[in-house]
Amino acid sequence: MVQRISLKNKLLPDLVEIQRDSFKWFLLEGLTEVLEFFPNISDPTSRLELQLFGKEYKIKFPRYSVRQAKSRDRTYSAQIYVPAKLTRKDIDLPSKDQNKTIKSLDLSSNHLQFSAEKQIKNKKYKKRLVFIGDLPIMTNRGTFIVSGTERVIINQIIRSPGIYYKQDIDKNGKQIYSASLISNRGSWLKFEIDPKGEIWIRIDKTHKVNAYIFLRAIGLNKNEIQKGLSKYAFLISASQSYSVKELAKEIGKNDIEEVTDEEALLIVYSKLRPNEPATVPVAKQMLYSRFFDPKRYDLGEVGRYKINKKLGLNIPKTFRVLSPQDILSSIDYLINIKDKNSGNLDDIDHLGNRRVRSVGELLQNQFRVGLNRLERIIRERMMICDIDSLSLSNLINPKPLIASVREFFGSSQLSQFMDQTNPVAELTHKRRISALGPGGFNKDRAGFAVRDLHPSHYGRICPIETPEGPNAGLIGSLATCARVNIFGFIETPFYPVHNGQVDYSNNPIYLTADEEDDFRVAPGDVKVNVQNYIEGDIIPVRYRQEFVTTIPNQVDYIAISPIQVISAATSLIPFLEHDDANRALMGSNMQRQAVPLLYPEKPIIGTGLETKIARDSGMVVISRTSGCVNYVSANKIGIQDNNGRTVLYRLKKYYRSNQDTCINQRPIVWVGEKIVVGQTLADGASTDCGEIALGRNILVAYMPWEGYNYEDAFLISERLVYEDVYTSIHIEKYEVECRQTKLGPEEITREIPNVSDHSLKDLDRNGIVVCGSWVEAGDILVGKITPKGEADQLPEGKLLRAIFGEKARDVRDTSLRLPNAAKGRVVNVRVFTRQKGDELPPGTNAMIRVYVAQKRKIQVGDKMAGRHGNKGIISRILPKQDMPYLCDGTPVDIVLNPLGVPSRMNVGQVFECLLGLAGGYLDKRFKIIPFDEMYGAEASRALVNRKLQEASILTKNKWIFNDQHPGKMQVFDGRTGEPFDNPVTIGRAYMLKLVHLVDDKIHARSTGPYSLVTQQPLGGRAQHGGQRLGEMEVWALEAFGAAYTLQELLTVKSDDMQARNEALNAIVKGKPIPKPGTPESFKVLMRELQSLGLDIAVHKLKLFENGQRRTVEVDLMSDSKEDRVARSNYEVLPVDDFEQFLY
């Protein structure tokens, strides 16, 4: 078994190869293919011809390194140059003498005629390299740097081009057979047999044409159709109804077999373009451009392969447009399904019918769009510009291609801001597979069938890892051992089995979902003996999408490992088989949210993939050479190789990630140490000795404690705070621009008006905060002043200023200050100016960026979780002496609610914590591969009990393992010293601190900004907004009859502007708060109704001096609150006025 496991570890591919291989394909083949397809362009007079030589394209070395691109907000890209040739053809018209010569010549010779009429002199120019655009280059970690931020292009899973047959039932319960011919680019064709038995062809889902008419239109004669169809009579009989009803109207014939090619073409054209006059050449051209023109229609290599395979054709894979044979064979297959019940229907959710488009293909499609735009611009320039003045430089404009690529990387749904919270998040993001995006599904319309698990997902797409919510099932993750082949289909490895014996001698065989269908495949947790024979009489296998059983001799293949079914993040969960799938899903997703800790610790209980994931994520530094360490510091490591050369490795120190977490690399080698190729030299964020370390091993107790762990809340010890067990560093970025305004430039300065010296204590002489300073909320980071407007200045003042210069101009303080609820240490200050050669936006003279690091200890309100979906919020931090303690006096670190286990069915956490306890006492770490039942029934329980017994014997502490209740022990109350009534489950669990920190969420507002229109307080923490009082809250107050509280909340505390100011004055002066007035939102409602033409106003009853009560209109818009005499609601216009109103 040891040999088999070591073999399997070698079989895990590089987990980021899907990104790197795809981009490599794009550079070697994809870009060449799309450039080669660029046509030779001539002007209308054929005097000028442009030719691109795509195969010889060159890429210039990137202008900036990866580090420079990140720090300067640039794109890490290379310039693409393509050799191009512009050929001019000077055409001389024939002279009179030449005309005489022509008449005496034999006019039948076209060649002589042509050569005499025109004399063409070609001016040949040398090929010149022309710049056509920038291409963002992938970093060695599989990411792109675009405008200084790290982005990832996620993989898209879409319907594969090809032909798919399906059977539906219409509203009357009758069967409809149809076939969809999907192209990579161009129109879709659908063949269908309706309930009446008629065969139709739909073009782009709308236009319906009779199948026989369409076959004639594409150039097939009657004999060819007869030969190509095994059931020709079925086609003719199916068209009888059409012949009688419609054919007579269209061309005046009753027999469909009498239709000529030209008539068929005109019928098809009239269906597609009903309002345009039809002619045969136009119809022919239209049909050609729709299905047979390589520029507009493309099946792709995959589509051609799938159609050939389905219909049994031998058309070359380079022929990527439709052929008449394809259409004829498609109809023949459809008739056979309907008439003979032969042939197979297709399942569109089967992974054999869905393919993955990775970064290379997505980029290729975007380049194709950009080159099409470029072609159109070149043609326009050739038509408009003077031919003699045209040259390569002003003919080929790189802007369309640059814009197309920028649009893709900047705004495509598949180009995403990389999740850099920790290495697992980073790796998972690169291996993500999305069914959304252009050409994919819409999450609002995607049904259950698309999202559901499919048997073909086994070993290809993880059944566990997917988001919760609207994207569930539409976004998945590639399984650990899966890879994508050249056609984009996902493959997974299997060992062949011969007569019940597994062949481990050769490399495993990779199979796609289609190829796997015809074999009996056993899972990876089937027991195999020393001679490599499968043990057991009945073996569970997958065969033709079904889960069945068979005998060992009939097994064709066996999976290489139990973990090949699941993704990289899920494979980090020990005892996964004991967890409910929903909780495992949460565990996988929450590992990606774990914050890198200041002191990371590798787990006692792992799965064996921790090192592999840490290495492939690119977070740790790997040695490229063998040799000896000759230099180590916090910033770099020097390795002297066998040739005596020193290779330096620079380490990342306190870098800010995309999610504001801290990336810091620490050396783990020492001077004089011998190094081999591939050895880990330095740890990064969330790694410990080259292994993933997302959290800490802490002592847990499953017991209730004074109700503080109600509803999954956690009770933790002060030790976790004081010993910085869960302390993390977060780095925030603050930036300010110094702009050129109409009134003059803004200035970065220490001389800020109306600011005390104490506020300037951390600024240098230029007004920028000194690196290393401690700053709190409201402190000035960068001093900046902006010129004020001079509208209120007298003319003589302006004249004096113009004469004597700007001595005492008015300025406004616009300094960059640290926002509310933030504090920390300034770790870096970067100044960008044009003088230094930095590229800045137009109108900006300088930009200053300040990085502030914050040390966050764990506190009440922070979210923690285990690896099994057991998440909760910290409800209280207890002193160490009050925590429950063990028999040897050790206080526990965290108290969890035992009620969180049975209903959630994530028992894996209990196995993990008990084995972790044994590991802690034995000073051992365990690697547990999931699905261990092949080693015997209840293997997990047996292992845990055995190791607890060993720990009990080794430490001579009998209380560690109790036969009466294994895994439980007596625990004492820290406050009283009394033992608790019942034994408690105690263990050492691996707990994570998640990125949902209370510091980022807690928020309060006294005064703050208001909305311009409604004058209500803004919402949200970022806007320093207020707490929303919604309709349900109003109902609650109404239920208690709290009328005055409601009035206050809806007016003074919300949008009654006048009452707001009056209330503030009253509070300041100690007077009673006046009555509220009309809310601003009511006035907005009135104006909206009036804008709709409704005569609406507010009236009140008023008692006049003569004792009469009359309604008076209230003018809400004026502050004076004057009353106006009420108008009649319905004023009748006189006839003259009415006519004047109309005209």
UniProtKB/Swiss-Prot annotation:
InterPro entries per record? DNA-dir_RNA_pol_bsu_ext_1_sf, DNA-dir_RNA_pol_bsu_external_1, DNA-dir_RNA_pol_su2, DNA-dir_RNAP_su2_dom, DNA-dir_RNAP_su2_hyb_sf, RNA_pol_bsu_bac, RNA_pol_bsu_CS, RNA_pol_bsu_protrusion
Q: Which CDD domains match?
A: RNA_pol_B_RPB2
The signal sequence is none
One GO term of the cellular component aspect?
Answer: mitochondrion
Q: Where are the transmembrane segments?
A: none
Keywords, in A-Z order: Chloroplast, DNA-directed RNA polymerase, Nucleotidyltransferase, Plastid, Transcription, Transferase
Q: Name one GO molecular function term.
A: DNA-directed RNA polymerase activity
Single Gene Ontology BP annotation: DNA-templated transcription
What class does this enzyme belong to in the EC scheme? transferase
Subunit organization: In plastids the minimal PEP RNA polymerase catalytic core is composed of four subunits: alpha, beta, beta', and beta''. When a (nuclear-encoded) sigma factor is associated with the core the holoenzyme is formed, which can initiate transcription.
Q: Give the family from UniProt.
A: Belongs to the RNA polymerase beta chain family.
PANTHER family linked to this entry: DNA-DIRECTED RNA POLYMERASE I SUBUNIT 2
Q: Function of this protein?
A: DNA-dependent RNA polymerase catalyzes the transcription of DNA into RNA using the four ribonucleoside triphosphates as substrates.
The protein's matches in HAMAP family, at most eight in alphabetical order, are given as:
RNApol_bact_RpoB (MF_01321)
Query: Which NCBIfam families does this entry report, sorted A to Z?
Result: PRK00405.1, rpoB
Q: What is this protein called?
A: DNA-directed RNA polymerase subunit beta
- Where does this protein come from, organism-wise? Porphyra purpurea (Red seaweed)
